[in-house]
Amino acid sequence: MSSSPSPGAAKSPYVRRALRGAVACALIASIAIAACLIWGGPKPLPPLRSIGDPFKDVRFDGMPALRFFTARDGTQLAYRRYDTADMGHGKGSVMLVHGSSANSNSVHPLAQSFLEAGYTVYAFDIRGHGKSGVKGQVSYLGQLDDDLEDFVNAVQPARPRTLLGFSSGGGFALRVAGSPRGVQFDYFLFMAPYIHYKAMTNRSGASSAWAAMGIPRLVSLILLNRVGVRNFNDLPVLNFAVTESPKADLVRQYSYALALSFQPPDDYRTVIRSISRPAEVIAGGEDELFFADKYRPLLDEAGRSDIPVTIVPETGHINLTLSSAGRAAAVAAIQRLDNRFDHRN
């Protein structure tokens, strides 16, 4: 008398087939991700003159020497302090965050304008730029947030404190403003801030002339980070259209970790809604990288009609921080914030 096969035995060929299919899919996915990591990086770009040329006529007279503070990982990070015996006292402090690939030199004219208006000014070499750490690199996602907190704790800038960011630095300032760490500051000023590549303010064609993104590598790293694999976060995902001038000391590439740390998260609308301190936005009417007239509807869409937007006419992206009109608009914005909210008590 023959025995019939057990249900488990009958199903075993299907189980084995499913397992083989799963292994094959995993192998194919692994090969695809590996290929994207190796060959899916950003392409090189020729220098973008509209970004580099405005600095040719900038004078750096009176730029203070670099100082350093120690971050929690022991790294010495650079900044400049603008302060004299008869200026820069009594009105609080302004902390300047430069744009992508740049350093504290790039905001020198803006720093001078705030010093002349009576503020103590701090200009950062954000980690991964200038003389702060390894160019184009941070050690982990979110390290820039930790660095800023370490700076405030170490230096104790005078209150009221304003965090001002320009371009990518404006996106970083926005990131801080909408986080629990925003309470370290009294005001925020975002100058032509980079919000997100999907934001309505982004000129996709113009922005791609300045920064080339390695999409295949970026997507692969996002997927790997979702499953806890962070071993490859030091790979470059952005190339910038910078000049080769040693004097400029610019950063050509950003790693995945730095690129994501120096901008708002994907849910930027929630970040905007979460800003708990007074803030303003300034943009140049002729900005080549971002749509200046879209900042107002973007803020309104996020429910922040209370955040004013100032458009400086006939002013491009870089010239917003270099021209007398752009610098005057920035000083006026912080003076307005001072008049509306008194944090000196």
Place the predicted regions along the sequence by residue:
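An N-terminal hydrophobic leader/cap segment in hydrolases
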Residues: 5-71, 75-83
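The serine-hydrolase catalytic nucleophile loop
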Residues: 100-112, 293
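Catalytic nucleophile-loop/oxyanion-hole region of alpha/beta-hydrolase
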Residues: 103-104, 129-155, 160
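Conserved alpha/beta-hydrolase
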Residues: 111-133
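Active-site nucleophile loop of the alpha/beta-hydrolase fold
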Residues: 189-199
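Short alpha-helix in the alpha/beta-hydrolase fold that links the catalytic acid
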Residues: 268, 277, 288-300
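Short beta-strand/loop motif that positions the catalytic acidic residue
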Residues: 275, 281-283
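Catalytic histidine-centered segment of alpha/beta-hydrolase-like enzymes
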Residues: 315-325
